[in-house]
A protein has these predicted regions:
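The feature marks long extracellular or luminal low-complexity segments
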Residues: 2-143
């Protein structure tokens, strides 16, 4: 009988931990939806896939329409190219600036639309549920 009680205590503790984890995840998921990331500018608008020309990207993080200061934003190209720095901190107006270097187009990988993803790494409290935005940059062939 004591073995059964001991087993039930362990099982009950595991259920409580799982429910607690789910509650924390749900809290962070709802909280992440209150943050909005928007692309403010991409310069130049039609970058060349030459592997050298930098593309300046500026994003803004807001919460309920107000700028969010001091959050770490992380940007990564999903299908080609590199970032000068992946992680930037938002300023007092909620802005973060990045420099993206497109890949060099070739016969095997012609110029195409590149998708970049930016995350707000600082919006979660308990579990990592990041606010995120995917956006595209159309690359043109280098001459």
């Amino acid at each position: 009988m004591f073995k059964l009680l001991k087993r039930n205590k362990i099982f009950s503790a595991l259920i409580i931990i799982a429910v607690l984890f789910m509650c924390m995840y749900c809290f962070d998921a709802v909280r992440a939806k209150t943050f909005e990331i928007e692309v403010i500018s991409i310069s130049p608008e039609m970058p060349v896939a030459d592997g050298e020309t930098p593309v300046e990207i500026k994003v803004r993080l807001t919460r309920s329409g107000k700028p969010v200061e001091g959050h770490y934003m992380f940007m990564i190209p999903l299908n080609g190219g590199t970032m000068q720095k992946n992680r930037e901190k938002t300023d007092e107006d909620g802005y973060a600036s990045y420099v993206y270097y497109p890949y060099r187009s070739s016969v095997l990988m012609p110029a195409q639309t590149v998708t970049l993803r930016v995350y707000d790494e600082s919006n979660s409290i308990f579990v990592i549920v990041n606010a995120a935005l995917d956006f595209d940059i159309e690359l043109k062939e280098h001459t």
